[in-house]
C-alpha cells in the first residue's frame, strides 16, 4: 500500500516521539515469523512497556535523526522491526532475546542505550529497579551483619583476656 506524504510525515513524527521518550532501542528482523507469534510478541511488548513498530528504513532513518538512536542507522537494512523500552532499559532486549530463543527466524540486529550501540546481552541482563534495590539492600544487610559479628567477637576476646 502506497503512503502519501502526510502518512509518511505522521509515521516519522510518531517514531521520533517514541524515540525521544525511550530509554533504549532494539532492532530486529522478523522475516519468516508467523503472524500468531508476532501477535504474541506485540502483546508481551505492551505488557512490558515496550513500543514496537515495523517501519520503512528511509522513514526510520529520518525519525531517529537528532535522537540517541541515530547510531543504529547502519542496522536499518531489510525488514526492520524497532522496539523502544519506555519503563526499563533492558525490557525490549530481554523480550526480543527470549522471543529469539523460541523462534529461529527472528534475528536481533542491534541495540542502543544512551546514544551508543550496545550488546543485546548487556541490555537484557540489566537489573530492573526493584532488582537493583534488592541487591543493594542485601549487600548492606550482609555488611552490617558481618560488622556486628566481628564487633561481638572482638568484645568476647577482650572479655576473655580480662578474665
Curated annotation (Swiss-Prot):
Alphabetized Pfam families for the sequence: Ribosomal_L10
GO molecular function, one term: large ribosomal subunit rRNA binding
Example GO BP: translation
Keyword Membrane set for record: no
UniProtKB keywords: Ribonucleoprotein, Ribosomal protein, RNA-binding, rRNA-binding
A cellular-component GO term for this protein: large ribosomal subunit
InterPro entries found in the cross-reference section: Ribosomal_uL10, Ribosomal_uL10-like_sf, Ribosomal_uL10_bac, Ribosomal_uL10_bac_type, Ribosomal_uL10_CS_bac
SUPFAM superfamilies: Ribosomal protein L10-like
PROSITE patterns per UniProt: RIBOSOMAL_L10
UniProt keyword annotation of Cytoplasm present: no
Family label: Belongs to the universal ribosomal protein uL10 family.
Protein task: Forms part of the ribosomal stalk, playing a central role in the interaction of the ribosome with GTP-bound translation factors.
Subunit structure: Part of the ribosomal stalk of the 50S ribosomal subunit. The N-terminus interacts with L11 and the large rRNA to form the base of the stalk. The C-terminus forms an elongated spine to which L12 dimers bind in a sequential fashion forming a multimeric L10(L12)X complex.
HAMAP family per UniProt: Ribosomal_uL10
Protein name: Large ribosomal subunit protein uL10
Native species: Haemophilus influenzae (strain PittGG)
Amino acid at each position: 500500500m502506497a503512503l502519501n506524504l502526510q502518512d509518511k510525515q505522521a509515521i516519522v513524527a510518531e517514531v521520533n516521539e517514541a524515540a525521544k521518550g525511550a530509554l533504549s532501542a532494539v532492532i530486529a528482523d522478523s522475516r519468516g515469523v508467523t503472524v500468531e507469534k508476532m501477535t504474541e510478541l506485540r502483546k508481551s511488548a505492551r505488557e512490558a512497556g515496550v513500543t514496537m513498530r515495523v517501519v520503512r528504513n528511509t522513514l526510520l532513518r529520518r525519525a531517529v535523526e537528532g535522537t540517541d538512536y541515530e547510531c543504529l542507522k547502519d542496522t536499518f537494512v531489510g525488514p526492520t522491526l524497532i522496539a523502544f523500552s519506555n519503563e526499563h532499559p533492558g525490557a525490549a532486549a530481554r523480550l526480543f532475546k527470549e522471543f529469539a530463543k523460541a523462534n529461529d527466524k527472528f534475528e536481533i540486529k542491534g541495540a542502543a542505550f544512551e546514544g551508543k550501540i550496545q550488546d543485546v546481552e548487556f541490555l537484557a541482563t540489566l537489573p530492573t529497579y526493584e532488582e537493583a534495590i534488592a541487591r543493594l539492600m542485601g549487600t548492606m544487610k550482609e555488611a552490617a551483619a558481618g560488622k556486628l559479628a566481628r564487633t561481638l567477637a572482638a568484645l568476647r576476646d577482650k572479655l576473655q583476656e580480662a578474665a
